From Swiss-Prot:
InterPro entries, A to Z: Ribosomal_bL35, Ribosomal_bL35-like, Ribosomal_bL35_CS, Ribosomal_bL35_sf
One annotated Gene Ontology cellular component of this protein: cytosolic large ribosomal subunit
Family assignment from sequence similarity: Belongs to the bacterial ribosomal protein bL35 family.
Lineage per the UniProt record: Bacteria, Bacillati, Bacillota, Bacilli, Bacillales
Pfam families according to UniProt: Ribosomal_L35p
Gene Ontology annotations of biological process type: translation
Record's protein name: Large ribosomal subunit protein bL35
Record keyword Signal present: no
Presence of keyword Ribosomal protein: yes
Gene3D superfamilies according to UniProt: 4.10.410.60
Keywords: Ribonucleoprotein, Ribosomal protein
Ranges of compositional bias, category Basic residues: 1-26
Length: 66
């Protein structure tokens, strides 16, 4: 059985927290800010936690991330 390899794209997008959850950044933050309200832009700056349904799938891609 070959070794599990870490999906490098996922490794760059997700970070593990101290409690074992996965942090991610929000989408819609690269351009077109004139159409977004100040409140929306402020909320997009903060990081978010990966939902439970996605966590199982992403955890397999991040096999060797401590």
């Amino acid at each position: 059985m070959p070794k599990m390899k870490t999906h490098r794209g996922s490794a760059k997008r997700f970070k593990k927290t101290g409690s074992g959850k996965l942090k991610r950044s929000h989408a819609y933050t690269s351009h077109l800010f004139a159409n977004k309200s100040q409140k929306q832009k402020r909320k997009l700056r903060k990081s978010a936690v990966v939902s439970a349904g996605d966590f199982k799938r992403i955890k397999q891609q991040l096999a060797n991330i401590k």
